[in-house]
């Protein structure tokens, strides 16, 4: 079974970018509440 490196990178970015974005918003919200 051949693994497509570009596909793995695309999936990793597609998952990690929105997740990091949500984490940043979450941290900013906590900081503002304090």
Swiss-Prot record:
<dbReference type="GO" id="GO:0009523">
    <property type="term" value="C:photosystem II"/>
</dbReference>
<keyword id="KW-0472">Membrane</keyword>
<comment type="function">
    <text>One of the components of the core complex of photosystem II (PSII). PSII is a light-driven water:plastoquinone oxidoreductase that uses light energy to abstract electrons from H(2)O, generating O(2) and a proton gradient subsequently used for ATP formation. It consists of a core antenna complex that captures photons, and an electron transfer chain that converts photonic excitation into a charge separation. This subunit is found at the monomer-monomer interface.</text>
</comment>
<protein>
    <recommendedName>
        <fullName>Photosystem II reaction center protein M</fullName>
    </recommendedName>
</protein>
<keyword id="KW-0150">Chloroplast</keyword>
<dbReference type="Pfam" id="PF05151">
    <property type="entry name" value="PsbM"/>
</dbReference>
<dbReference type="InterPro" id="IPR037269">
    <property type="entry name" value="PSII_PsbM_sf"/>
</dbReference>
<dbReference type="GO" id="GO:0009535">
    <property type="term" value="C:chloroplast thylakoid membrane"/>
</dbReference>
<keyword id="KW-1133">Transmembrane helix</keyword>
<comment type="similarity">
    <text>Belongs to the PsbM family.</text>
</comment>
<dbReference type="GO" id="GO:0019684">
    <property type="term" value="P:photosynthesis, light reaction"/>
</dbReference>
<keyword id="KW-0602">Photosynthesis</keyword>
<feature type="transmembrane region" description="Helical">
    <location>
        <begin position="5"/>
        <end position="25"/>
    </location>
</feature>
<comment type="subunit">
    <text>PSII is composed of 1 copy each of membrane proteins PsbA, PsbB, PsbC, PsbD, PsbE, PsbF, PsbH, PsbI, PsbJ, PsbK, PsbL, PsbM, PsbT, PsbX, PsbY, PsbZ, Psb30/Ycf12, at least 3 peripheral proteins of the oxygen-evolving complex and a large number of cofactors. It forms dimeric complexes.</text>
</comment>
<keyword id="KW-0793">Thylakoid</keyword>
<keyword id="KW-0812">Transmembrane</keyword>
<keyword id="KW-0674">Reaction center</keyword>
<keyword id="KW-0604">Photosystem II</keyword>
<dbReference type="InterPro" id="IPR007826">
    <property type="entry name" value="PSII_PsbM"/>
</dbReference>
<keyword id="KW-0934">Plastid</keyword>
